[in-house]
Amino acid sequence: MDHSQCLVTIYAAAVLLGLRLQQGSCQHYLHIRPAPSDNLPLVDLIEHPDPIFDPKEKDLNETLLRSLMGGHFDPNFMAMSLPEDRLGVDDLAELDLLLRQRPSGAMPGEIKGLEFYDGLQPGKKHRLSKKLRRKLQMWLWSQTFCPVLYTWNDLGSRFWPRYVKVGSCYSKRSCSVPEGMVCKPAKSVHLTILRWRCQRRGGQRCTWIPIQYPIIAECKCSC
């Protein structure tokens, strides 16, 4: 490790230990299927287990369903068959590490506005060079950055498109020093998809209806 990298590590540790971070307990949530991402409000769906209420092959006409979706169909987040580039649960830790190496978006103001001083020598206090300051800021940002991790979710045959890309926040690592804070959902958006709905009044009648399906759009480090 060269002298510059060593200084970055020392200063970063000192800065993080000096930050005032609130700690809090984490609450776990029980989901019913199909479950939107993490702890966002669940879609109020009651699914009867009897396969008689499943759509038949004639009800899965892609041309017709596409027309019902209109401009709501988003190929980046929806698919009729399971995409080959899907990620498993075991891949999330690796993806989280990869995305944190190059944080996206704008650098948080509380990190961008930090000033660093060389106070290692008693009685002396000098502002660090711009290059070293930038390295420290990037290091802090990578440690506290909470990327959204996207995976494909199978909603079952009663939803179209059947596969939706949902977001999650990786909470198996702490995003603070001292440890205690984790990445949690901070913002959500809604996708419009179709749900196969059956009613028994006056004989069984089934049709596709549009529903709003929430997915995580932003994660933040919090208690």
From Swiss-Prot:
Gene3D superfamilies xrefs: Cystine-knot cytokines, Helix hairpin bin
Compartments reported by the entry: Secreted
Keyword line: Chondrogenesis, Developmental protein, Differentiation, Disulfide bond, Glycoprotein, Secreted, Signal
SUPFAM superfamilies: Cystine-knot cytokines
One GO cellular component, as annotated: extracellular space
Signal peptide residues on this chain, from the entry's feature table: 1-26
Domain of life: Eukaryota
Principal place of residence: secreted
Glycan attachment positions: 61
GO terms under biological process: cartilage development; dorsal/ventral pattern formation; negative regulation of BMP signaling pathway; negative regulation of lens fiber cell differentiation; negative regulation of smooth muscle cell differentiation; osteoblast differentiation
Pfam families, sorted: Noggin
Disulfides per UniProt: 146-183, 169-219, 175-221, 198-206
Induction comment: By sonic ectopic hedgehog.
Its biological purpose: Inhibitor of bone morphogenetic proteins (BMP) signaling. Controls somitogenesis by sequestering the BMP-4 activity which in turn differentiates distinct subtypes of the mesoderm along the mediolateral axis.
Quaternary structure and partners: Homodimer.
Family that this chain belongs to: Belongs to the noggin family.
Protein name stated in the entry: Noggin
Gene: NOG
